[in-house]
Amino acid sequence: MTTDLSEDNTLTKPDGRNLRTDDSRKKIVSAFLQLIRQGTVAPSAEDIAKKANVGLRTVFRRFKEMELLYREMVIELENNFAPEVAKPWKTTDMESQLQELLERRSVMYEELMPYRVASNYHKYHSEFIQQAHAYWNVVVQKNLENILPFNKSSEPVLFNAIETALSFDTWLQL
């Protein structure tokens, strides 16, 4: 068990209730992500409680509404995949970088597919998911602009064609 030194320099022990709350919260988020990964686009609170091995009331106490679980999913995915998007290119020429971009995205898209399908299903009811998708679109667009010798403003048709070919939506159709 860990202990903290409080501001008045006395030794304090962590509160057991807070530890249980954090533990059950982590179990619920993990169960939610597992259910989506397994193909359940809209897991119910009952499914989550069963998978997390917690009571249904615990799910509702930790997450007053399901929207909060989708927020957790988005945050988790951003934390996992942002480093991959920000990783420097191994090569310097455009063709090789485009090939590397395609390889990275294909791996990422396969990992993201169940989560992205679930978030697409819920985005029309969630301002947060809509904002997260818009942010992600800007990130991947900037990623592509850093490779190409032109940008969306200078060559909109060509840029949009390449962007569409490399998009998650196109990958999903394959």
Protein language model features and the residues they cover:
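Short hydrophobic/aromatic patch on the recognition helix
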Residues: 54-63
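Solvent-exposed, amphipathic alpha-helical segments
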Residues: 27, 31-38, 84-88, 161, ...
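Basic, helix-initiating cap at the start of DNA-binding domains
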Residues: 1-42, 46-51, 68
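Short linear capping/connector segments at secondary-structure termini
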Residues: 85-90, 119-127
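Amphipathic alpha-helical linker/stalk segments
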Residues: 11, 34-43, 50, 71-101
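DNA-binding alpha-helical recognition surfaces that contact promoter or target DNA
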Residues: 30, 61, 71-72
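Generic detection of well-ordered alpha-helical segments
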Residues: 18, 22, 26, 30, ...
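Amphipathic alpha-helical packing segments from all-alpha helical-bundle domains
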Residues: 107, 111, 117, 125-160, ...
